[in-house]
């Protein structure tokens, strides 16, 4: 089997990670003690991707839980599925990172990283054929962002040919813990651009807007935001966890989704959007699902896809439905909105269907888009970064941990380069190839 090792780092990473395991354990019929009580062979067919089989038919998540302070992991341990995790896989410090990227990346995190790598090695050794790693973390804090990116680069060194996939929560002033989030996020993106193969950008701004506007929750809690995250994570990993043909492993997904190595930041979407504990009164039709899935209001990144173009798209439909209808609707979307898909990558939309719907829904659809509009998210963070950095505000917290201002400047320009690269491919057309021969005519244009 092709296994995935899951790592969750920091407070946010552990909270969304714990939710992810609750949701997928439920989908695979695994109870909180790790026993199987399911009703379908499909649930067990690819269970080994995310779970180890222990003695007594117990299924144990291939999960490593990391934090620089014990608090969040204690909550996970005492939470609904806390007993399913392997006790040795909790790795934590006592000092905390104090929302400081430098502490996570260079000082406190660097001291803990070797004990995490020991557990990573142990998990990888129990795999038959490891396909890669997935990390859940946020980019706004200290541990998930600083230590998370440190772990990525260390794992990259040791497993250069394995896929590195992240679920990265982007900070937003609407749901803010700290004022230095733009610093931490920019320093992290600087790392992610170079060291990951696939990054799902889960944007707190978008999650907040969905809760507030669509779900009409006046004061969304982290629990409400995380409900959306877990639905999305369950959706995008469906093809990895259930039998199917399309994007059935991390590498195939990367091959379909990433046309240029640096442009691997995906915009996830989900339909139908429901709030926690609400029941759906009627099942959506396939046309409604398709329409909602491509709607900017359903995107988990606060970017409007109509402001950019799709390089590639993957769609995952779940539930019992007609494949023919799904294909028709997906073609329909592309034909009606052809200007929003780059024409120089033909057939850049791929669709998968899985029979098992998520709990509480008859049908759902998950969207993964590699859109040039994701630059809006990076621009937003870059503007906030620049505002503080030009005054050198709060820098002493970072230089005090041994960082150099130069690293900030490099991170800033790397993120701005990323924005320009997205823009370049947004403007590119299919017939530009021939224009290089006619140098002379170019000047008049």
Swiss-Prot record:
CDD domains: beta_tubulin. It comes from the Eukaryota. Some glutamate residues at the C-terminus are polyglycylated, resulting in polyglycine chains on the gamma-carboxyl group. Glycylation is mainly limited to tubulin incorporated into axonemes (cilia and flagella) whereas glutamylation is prevalent in neuronal cells, centrioles, axonemes, and the mitotic spindle. Both modifications can coexist on the same protein on adjacent residues, and lowering polyglycylation levels increases polyglutamylation, and reciprocally. The precise function of polyglycylation is still unclear. Residues 424-445 are annotated as: Disordered. SMART domains: Tubulin, Tubulin_C. Residues 429-445 have a biased composition (Acidic residues). GO terms for cellular component: cytoplasm; microtubule. Keywords: Cytoplasm, Cytoskeleton, GTP-binding, Isopeptide bond, Magnesium, Metal-binding, Microtubule, Nucleotide-binding. It is found in: Cytoplasm, Cytoskeleton. GTP binds at residues 11, 69, 138, 142-144, 204, 226. PROSITE patterns: TUBULIN, TUBULIN_B_AUTOREG. It holds the Pfam family Tubulin_C. GO terms for biological process: microtubule cytoskeleton organization; mitotic cell cycle; negative regulation of microtubule polymerization; neuron migration. InterPro entries: Beta-tubulin_BS, Beta_tubulin, Tub_FtsZ_C, Tubulin, Tubulin/FtsZ-like_C, Tubulin/FtsZ_2-layer-sand-dom, Tubulin/FtsZ_GTPase_sf, Tubulin_C. A motif (MREI motif) lies at residues 1-4. One of its GO terms (molecular function) is GTP binding. Belongs to the tubulin family. The MREI motif is common among all beta-tubulin isoforms and may be critical for tubulin autoregulation. Dimer of alpha and beta chains. A typical microtubule is a hollow water-filled tube with an outer diameter of 25 nm and an inner diameter of 15 nM. Alpha-beta heterodimers associate head-to-tail to form protofilaments running lengthwise along the microtubule wall with the beta-tubulin subunit facing the microtubule plus end conferring a structural polarity. Microtubules usually have 13 protofilaments but different protofilament numbers can be found in some organisms and specialized cells. This is Tubulin beta-2 chain. It comes from Gallus gallus (Chicken).
